[in-house]
Amino acid sequence: MAERMKGLLPLAVAVGILAFLWTWVALNFTFHWVTNGDLGNGLDLPANFHLIVPAAFVAWAMFFAAGGDNEAAKKVAIANVFGAAAAFVVLWGAGELADLPDFWSIALLVAVMAALLVVLGGLGDWFFIPATFGAFASVFFWWIATGLDKWAPGGGGVGNSVKALGDPATAGAGAFGGVISTPIGWVFVNILACLTIGVVLGMLSTRLAALFTPKPKPVKHEAPPAGSAVA
């Protein structure tokens, strides 16, 4: 077990470094660098386009689950698009069938899209079903966190400004009093972007780990004693 853990150390260091950098960049991007006004508590109001830390970790994990190589990166990148698109159908269609407070439209579309993603696995080995579910879940989760826009009328907020945040009619239903209220189109774009970043992080982590892996020492071959017979 000790040898196995020792063998994982280069990858562990690489993942730790990249995880720190991604988390630091994503949170600063969302709450300090690209924003729409001062919230008065040391943080800023996130713009409609923002970065979501956990989404990248989902795709990063799927990269390793798919094999952790270039082929895995392709599989997960494709799966991200299919899964996110399937979730967007739910986001858009649920409110068309039945909006707040009826959940049956959400449940129905989730069932249909989940079944469809499984069936599409028959297209070939390139269609990695687990990653499609990871992408689907990421979009769906962020939709809930950001106010269930379209299903909940005005749930994604209106105007995305500090002034709009101060009015219950325009603040939206997102977490933290509407701070992360987001329209469904941006929910889709933001999560898909972060899922793609997760694939890149996976590829970078394997390459960085290779740099940290000690090179095997060359084996020294001793010269035969002088006068010995050579077979």
Question: Each PLM stretch: what is its role?
Answer:
Residues A73-F82, F103-L108, F127-F136:
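Cytoplasmic-side transmembrane-helix entry/capping segments in multi-pass membrane proteins
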Residues M1-E3, L18-D44, M62-K74, A86-L100, ...:
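Short juxtamembrane and helix-loop transition motifs at transmembrane-helix boundaries
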Residues V15-N28, N80, A84-E96, V110-G122, ...:
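Transmembrane alpha-helical segments of multi-pass membrane transport proteins and ion-pumping complexes
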Residues A72-A77, P153-G154, I191-L192:
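Short, tandemly repeated low-complexity microdomains enriched for cysteine and small residues
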Residues G16, F20, F31-G68, A111-L117, ...:
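Pore- and pathway-forming membrane helices of multi-pass small-molecule/ion transporters and channels
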Residues M1-A14:
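N-terminal membrane topogenic signal
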Residues L211-A231:
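Short, highly charged, low-complexity non-transmembrane loops/tails of multi-pass membrane proteins
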Residues F176-L201:
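Individual transmembrane alpha-helices with interfacial aromatic-anchor signatures
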